[in-house]
Amino acid sequence: MLKKVFETTNLKDSFQVEIGTYARNVDSSILVRYQDTVVLTTMVFSRKPNNLDFLPLTVIYQEKLYAAGKIPGSFLRREGRSNDHEILTSRLIDRSLRPLFPDYFQQEVQVINTVLSLDPDFKSELASMLGSSLSLLISEIPFFEAISGVYVGKINNEFIINPTLQQLANSTLHLIVAGTKHNVTMIEAHANEVSEQDFLEAINFAHQYIKKLCLFQENIKQQFAPVKMTKTLHQTEQIQQQSFFAKNHSQVKQAILSCNSKNDLQQLKEQILDQAKQTPFFKTIDAITVFDYEAHKKHLQITENLFQKLSKQEMRSLILQEKIRPDKRELEEIRTLESQIDLLPRAHGSALFTRGKTQSLAAVTLGCLSESKIIDGLSDEQNKRFMLHYNFPPFSVGAVGRYTAPSRREIGHGTLAEKAISQVLPEEKDFPYTIRVVSEILESNGSSSQATVCSSSLALMASGVPLKKAVAGISVGLVFDQETNKYVILSDIQGLEDHVGDMDLKIAGTNKGITALQMDLKIQGIPFKILQEAFLQAKKGRLHILEQMNQTISQPRLEVSKYAPKVCMMQIKPEKIRDIIGSGGKIINQIIESHDGVKIDIEQDGRVFVMHSNLETVKKTVAFIESLIQEIQVGTCYQASILRFLSDKQGKMIGAVAQVCPGIEGLIHVNKMKFQKITDVLKIGETVLVKCTKINERGRIDFLLLPKKTQEKNS
């Protein structure tokens, strides 16, 4: 491969691309420099043909901690399995690229993006997307159009391309858009209740910048002039397809129109495959005729692929031409909705949300702030106090499957729902808890991630988390004939419609605006007009769902569950923190032990969070801490406990050490007492009333023991 270097011009940010210098055993090697961010993209594909009905594309995004000058914190001190950010970025790039591959290309492709250096203000995700696109574009793979991605923020009603971290912190919109020079192919965002119109304007704004980056890649492609792989359908394959379609057309259509289309289609498929198994295949080896297993296996695979193709064609035709959906709903009709709360007595909050044959059970757990998730990646270490986990067990689709670690899909769906809900959560100062929501998908027939948004919102309200507003989510689909430009937009798509459709647009939000969004396409783009219609149709469906949810619970409960821990926040002076912790944590451990294992979190700014399941224990702990940090004043009387007696080197009694609270001790000097033998009057552990008479420059305190009459009067 030729070694060449290219650089963008007339753009806000400068990208430099170096091709063919590194990792030269691959099909494509791209080094992308985006200011101080450096990403190496490699692409390798298999020459072995596959007879599959999908593209075996694998996109990997990996961060090396040396890119930010950090040593991994794990026991082995090396990078381990991919973290959530790496998985989500891998999915982001995959979803941007996949629509650009032709249906006939089914060879295995692996694109790996390795972050070698990182400037946090210049996103490695964008450099990876550029490198991934270019690696495919200059190869012989039939990937014909460049894609690029940009971030968009919004500050003071102005859109900003590729904002810095500081700008993003003040932005009401966090939007990532990917696309070709003609159309948008992928959208992902979370926002602070941003309107549909503002979103559409932001997407259009992003596309203007995307066009320039795509043209930059097209210019590089021209210099390499790659010869692309092509495929034409052979006459034998055409005849085989026509014969199969003619023979099974009416049966497939009838199965789709049945009341139980999904099961009927599956039964029909098994019936056709059983018939195909009866077809004999033989070959001759050394004048001996034997059964040809390979040919038989290939025949079954072709039959299954043809069935999938015919089913898709018939379903799309019914939707496009006759406006008939598999479950006979109207185009904008939402499936039957059901919801209930408080299913799990001991969980801190729970809700079940059912939409048609999709069902999500959400459970909420409230914990102390020290239980927040620590995120340690290339960026600075952060604490995450809200987590939403999505579980998709195989039984949810009536299948037998393996139980393993969360898949990339589960992590992606959970993060989307998490972003949707996080926009309406209370501030930490108003609700000092770590919040974990788990969504268990009990049934699935499409839109399970958006069912998770709904069940989570209901469960959080039921748990007493003061959400600003309820949040609902909906998936909108599209069937688009690119030859005639005829299209149909479908609200609340189910599994079959998602499978045969061209778009999956997931939008979650409140009655005011959008809080999270994700759009994936199976075609190379859609006109902006269709996107506008889809946004408005999604809004209509979202408001309908919110109305139904509000009938179950419309406002957060005023108190948390009786099983949830109670918390109290107090503000102290930062210099008083040491008085609570003590030497080696001695004092704070004493507080925890003497107050039934209470949890205490202390922040550097002086905020102290006290948490326990018993509210009285919380109050007693707070009162004790307040006594710890109180400042002794001369002339003020205090209850004190006698700790020990002091003697000088000759053994002569000096006085008694009295403790007002842990860390605050003073001396009752024998000279200030009217009796000679102090041990006759005081006993260790006895509580007495003392008066502070002096605090010297070194902080030493002198106490005066008050007469018993005064003590009795004060008691």
UniProtKB/Swiss-Prot annotation:
Which PROSITE patterns did the record assign?
Answer: KH_TYPE_1, S1
What UniProt keywords are attached to this protein's entry? Cytoplasm, Magnesium, Metal-binding, Nucleotidyltransferase, RNA-binding, Transferase
From the Swiss-Prot or TrEMBL record, what is one GO molecular function term?
polyribonucleotide nucleotidyltransferase activity
Gene3D superfamilies (alphabetical): GHMP Kinase, N-terminal domain (3.30.230.70), K Homology domain, type 1 (3.30.1370.10), Nucleic acid-binding proteins (2.40.50.140)
Enzymatic class:
transferase
> Do you know which InterPro entries this protein is assigned to?
ExoRNase_PH_dom1, ExoRNase_PH_dom2, ExoRNase_PH_dom2_sf, KH_dom, KH_dom_type_1, KH_dom_type_1_sf, NA-bd_OB-fold, PNPase
Q: Which residues bind Mg(2+)?
A: D498, D504
Q: What is its EC number?
A: 2.7.7.8
Q: Which domain of life is it from?
A: Bacteria
| Ranges for domain KH | 565-625
Q: Name one GO biological process term.
A: mRNA catabolic process
Entry similarity comment: Belongs to the polyribonucleotide nucleotidyltransferase family.
Question: What does this chain do?
Answer: Involved in mRNA degradation. Catalyzes the phosphorolysis of single-stranded polyribonucleotides processively in the 3'- to 5'-direction.
What HAMAP family does the entry give? PNPase
Q: Would you tell me the protein name for this molecule?
A: Polyribonucleotide nucleotidyltransferase
Species source reads: Aster yellows witches'-broom phytoplasma (strain AYWB)
Q: Which gene encodes it?
A: pnp
